């Protein structure tokens, strides 16, 4: 009897254990590497893989699914493909690629996956976001109406940029495209120091396919000017694989979207999208996608449009934040009719066209006003700027035309000669040294002098215009700082009178030596 009771007790214990047993089967979506060549792994299996999904190889290297067939998947390897071997197991993560976002990334240099590349230690970001996200819809947007000041005279006055705009910087190599972008970032330092948190402009600089030495110079320049404290640098250098170069601008855009979606303002530089397109072309050809014009795949337009459409000025309900994009595109011998330049021109809200001929003539920044345009920026210009800049573009265009005409050596009447002389002074006033941005109030003073006080200006020899400009601005700051502050919004008749008296007195005592 005793033994039988023991048996029944044992049976009940076993039954209880079986009924309460809870060890669910863990299902994983796995596959096997068939081949790997030039950073592309062909994987058998992965039946439930999604396009754009992140996967892990046996060695720990990450990859992204960019091609789906009946029983195979084409995966781009985010790292060294030597670590991936035939027969390796591949696991799906169930997630797309994410990057850390937030204020913790300011002042840091990261790669396309958000991993630190500087000596600042681990990034402890509270938030992470998908690098691919849908652009804001029509209802969520607002028209561009706030100025984004670059500190560059010829741009702020003649090709104004607004917060939320997409303005292309295009031109041949080594003629100042990156310099314009850097100067715009540096100029935000002065503005950020004077405004509250919600009006500050945070910056993201994305370096795509550049030499590491070039990126190091950019980072050092930002450090020297104090601009790195509000800037994040995303780097996919020339030594990185094509998939990393392809992901970099999307990662940078996601970092900028954090500020946009939280009611703040952000400026993002893509330097440059030509190399980005080349990286995508390389990936597409290796994935055996059919090539189109210039061997680019058919969806190269969508690759750039879905990136640039994420730049926007948000509506009041969405927090009034903004993301301003300055993409850079490199041309070959000034050919803007190539495939990628024409694509990006059609996507953006205007372009700043740099010309090598102007650059070698000494007119820097070498902006060709005739080919440059800002389609929405004028709505964001200050009233004081509109009043002085209205006739400047026309004067410069007339001067360029008359300059060509005067080369024939024919006799010129007095009015034509006057226009030529005025044009020479205007060209000198619009020249600007790199990394020395100028406030909008200082620009207004100089252009008002040209437009309304040319008789005073013409007393200065043209070779001394740069010295005159430098000394005059210093004179305003030290002796008449109140006048500059009044110019931050509008220009009244009283201010015009003050400027006339100040300039007249200054010209008489200006020392050319």
Curated annotation (Swiss-Prot):
Binding residues for ATP: 171-178
Principal cellular location given in the protein's record: membrane
Source organism superkingdom: Bacteria
Site, Required for activity: residue positions: 372
GO cellular component terms, semicolon-separated: plasma membrane; proton-transporting ATP synthase complex
UniProt keyword Secreted, yes or no: no
InterPro entries, per database record: ATP_synth_asu-like_sf, ATP_synth_asu_C, ATP_synth_asu_C_sf, ATP_synth_F1_a_nt-bd_dom, ATP_synth_F1_asu, ATPase_a/bsu_AS, ATPase_F1/V1/A1_a/bsu_N, ATPase_F1/V1/A1_a/bsu_N_sf
EC number: 7.1.2.2
Catalytic activity reported: ATP + H2O + 4 H(+)(in) = ADP + phosphate + 5 H(+)(out)
Key words of the record: ATP synthesis, ATP-binding, Cell inner membrane, Cell membrane, CF(1), Hydrogen ion transport, Ion transport, Membrane, Nucleotide-binding, Translocase, Transport
Its job: Produces ATP from ADP in the presence of a proton gradient across the membrane. The alpha chain is a regulatory subunit.
Subunit structure: F-type ATPases have 2 components, CF(1) - the catalytic core - and CF(0) - the membrane proton channel. CF(1) has five subunits: alpha(3), beta(3), gamma(1), delta(1), epsilon(1). CF(0) has three main subunits: a(1), b(2) and c(9-12). The alpha and beta chains form an alternating ring which encloses part of the gamma chain. CF(1) is attached to CF(0) by a central stalk formed by the gamma and epsilon chains, while a peripheral stalk is formed by the delta and b chains.
HAMAP family the UniProt entry points to: ATP_synth_alpha_bact
Family assignment from sequence similarity: Belongs to the ATPase alpha/beta chains family.
Name of the protein this chain belongs to: ATP synthase subunit alpha
Organism, as annotated: Wolbachia sp. subsp. Drosophila simulans (strain wRi)
